[in-house]
Amino acid sequence: MTTARLYIMHAKEGHDAALETALRNLSEAVAAFPGSEGAELLRDAGNERRFVFIEKWASIEAHEAIKADFKKLPMGPLMDALDGPPDGSYYDYLVR
């Protein structure tokens, strides 16, 4: 069953475009990992600085298995654009 890893992120003032670009690039990188079922990116319709990034995985174990390789990704641009740490949690799909 697919598991989602959902992150809520806020861009620094004036960095929303940079965060969007970094998350688009991250979605492509995530899709290439074994066990990944892709990623989705949403922007809050009422707050251009607030994003939701959803990684879809075959299982929590599949996500945890790639953590060492994930840490090798160039995360500088994403981290520079963030206004604080992302809020992330695993979710199980109930209806799709």
Language-model regions, residue ranges each:
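Short, flexible segments with low predicted structural confidence
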Residues: 1-3, 18, 34-36
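Glycine-rich beta-strand-turn "strand-cap" elements at beta-sheet edges
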Residues: 1-3, 40-49, 76-96
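Short, well-ordered beta-strand segments in beta-rich or mixed alpha/beta enzyme
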Residues: 3-10, 40-67
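Short, surface-exposed ligand-recognition loops at beta-strand->loop->(often short) alpha-helix junctions
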Residues: 10-21
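Short alpha-helical
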Residues: 14, 25, 48, 61, ...
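An amphipathic, aromatic/His-enriched active-site/gating alpha helix that lines ligand/cofactor pockets
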Residues: 25-37, 56-89
